[in-house]
Amino acid sequence: MVMNPDAVRNVVGIIGNLISFGLFLSPLPTFVTIVKKKDVEEFVPDPYLATFLNCALWVFYGLPFIHPNSILVVTINGTGLLIEIAYLAIYFAYAPKPKRCRMLGVLTVELVFLAAVAAGVLLGAHTYDKRSLIVGTLCVFFGTLMYAAPLTIMKQVIATKSVEYMPFTLSLVSFINGICWTIYAFIRFDILITIPNGMGTLLGAAQLILYFCYYDGSTAKNKGALELPKDGDSSAV
């Protein structure tokens, strides 16, 4: 019995939504640690800022006046948006002033950008096709940035030879999420979905490789004093 490709694609899409929800929740242990220690230590907010922007764009994309009949897009990304806001609020609460200022600066730029996109699309594009194309292209671009954001942490892992600040759960779920949505995109080939998720698969695999390469070194360091780079060395601008 040959299954309908559309039916298979829908099933993969539902699985993808569930995995995406898991991806949003995967950093939770990191923030539990931050709350317990009342210190963000060397954790960086870059992945959460990137995910915040990505989710906000996809929510906008899924609205009825941009791309009708996209309720699943709105619900999963709306949920993700709320979760990222919670993560950023926790980070802000326990970060030192320089890190707070940096985070607020990036967040302000993102909000201004979102407002500009909304105004430009609603006032300048008057058909669903044009609005969907413009916002969809932005979603692809910033979705790629979301997956690339952990490069900051990967750089830190290599510099410190420690995986302490690269959560394994986040890396694993990112990898699985990328695979799922890449398969979804290939069933009925969609380049807009393939590009960011294909990159997500590759970067997720790279993070897992780094994790297993440096896990023993991280364990050894944790037995003594863990020497971490200064803020200027551990984060990308």
From Swiss-Prot:
<feature type="transmembrane region" description="Helical; Name=5">
    <location>
        <begin position="133"/>
        <end position="153"/>
    </location>
</feature>
<dbReference type="InterPro" id="IPR047664">
    <property type="entry name" value="SWEET"/>
</dbReference>
<keyword id="KW-0813">Transport</keyword>
<dbReference type="GO" id="GO:0015757">
    <property type="term" value="P:galactose transmembrane transport"/>
</dbReference>
<dbReference type="GO" id="GO:0005886">
    <property type="term" value="C:plasma membrane"/>
</dbReference>
<feature type="transmembrane region" description="Helical; Name=4">
    <location>
        <begin position="103"/>
        <end position="123"/>
    </location>
</feature>
<feature type="topological domain" description="Extracellular">
    <location>
        <begin position="188"/>
        <end position="190"/>
    </location>
</feature>
<dbReference type="GO" id="GO:0051119">
    <property type="term" value="F:sugar transmembrane transporter activity"/>
</dbReference>
<feature type="topological domain" description="Cytoplasmic">
    <location>
        <begin position="92"/>
        <end position="102"/>
    </location>
</feature>
<comment type="similarity">
    <text>Belongs to the SWEET sugar transporter family.</text>
</comment>
<feature type="topological domain" description="Cytoplasmic">
    <location>
        <begin position="32"/>
        <end position="46"/>
    </location>
</feature>
<feature type="transmembrane region" description="Helical; Name=3">
    <location>
        <begin position="71"/>
        <end position="91"/>
    </location>
</feature>
<keyword id="KW-0762">Sugar transport</keyword>
<feature type="domain" description="MtN3/slv 2">
    <location>
        <begin position="134"/>
        <end position="216"/>
    </location>
</feature>
<feature type="topological domain" description="Extracellular">
    <location>
        <begin position="1"/>
        <end position="10"/>
    </location>
</feature>
<comment type="subunit">
    <text>Forms homooligomers and/or heterooligomers.</text>
</comment>
<keyword id="KW-1133">Transmembrane helix</keyword>
<feature type="topological domain" description="Extracellular">
    <location>
        <begin position="68"/>
        <end position="70"/>
    </location>
</feature>
<keyword id="KW-0472">Membrane</keyword>
<keyword id="KW-0927">Auxin signaling pathway</keyword>
<dbReference type="GO" id="GO:0060918">
    <property type="term" value="P:auxin transport"/>
</dbReference>
<keyword id="KW-0677">Repeat</keyword>
<dbReference type="Pfam" id="PF03083">
    <property type="entry name" value="MtN3_slv"/>
</dbReference>
<feature type="topological domain" description="Cytoplasmic">
    <location>
        <begin position="212"/>
        <end position="237"/>
    </location>
</feature>
<feature type="transmembrane region" description="Helical; Name=2">
    <location>
        <begin position="47"/>
        <end position="67"/>
    </location>
</feature>
<dbReference type="GO" id="GO:0009734">
    <property type="term" value="P:auxin-activated signaling pathway"/>
</dbReference>
<keyword id="KW-0812">Transmembrane</keyword>
<dbReference type="GO" id="GO:0016020">
    <property type="term" value="C:membrane"/>
</dbReference>
<keyword id="KW-1003">Cell membrane</keyword>
<dbReference type="GO" id="GO:0010930">
    <property type="term" value="P:negative regulation of auxin mediated signaling pathway"/>
</dbReference>
<feature type="transmembrane region" description="Helical; Name=7">
    <location>
        <begin position="191"/>
        <end position="211"/>
    </location>
</feature>
<dbReference type="GO" id="GO:0008643">
    <property type="term" value="P:carbohydrate transport"/>
</dbReference>
<feature type="topological domain" description="Extracellular">
    <location>
        <begin position="124"/>
        <end position="132"/>
    </location>
</feature>
<feature type="domain" description="MtN3/slv 1">
    <location>
        <begin position="11"/>
        <end position="98"/>
    </location>
</feature>
<protein>
    <recommendedName>
        <fullName>Bidirectional sugar transporter SWEET5</fullName>
    </recommendedName>
</protein>
<comment type="function">
    <text>Mediates both low-affinity uptake and efflux of sugar across the plasma membrane. Can transport galactose. Prevents growth but promotes senescence. Involved in regulating the crosstalk between sugar and auxin. Regulates negatively the auxin signaling pathway and translocation.</text>
</comment>
<dbReference type="InterPro" id="IPR004316">
    <property type="entry name" value="SWEET_rpt"/>
</dbReference>
<feature type="transmembrane region" description="Helical; Name=6">
    <location>
        <begin position="167"/>
        <end position="187"/>
    </location>
</feature>
<feature type="transmembrane region" description="Helical; Name=1">
    <location>
        <begin position="11"/>
        <end position="31"/>
    </location>
</feature>
<feature type="topological domain" description="Cytoplasmic">
    <location>
        <begin position="154"/>
        <end position="166"/>
    </location>
</feature>
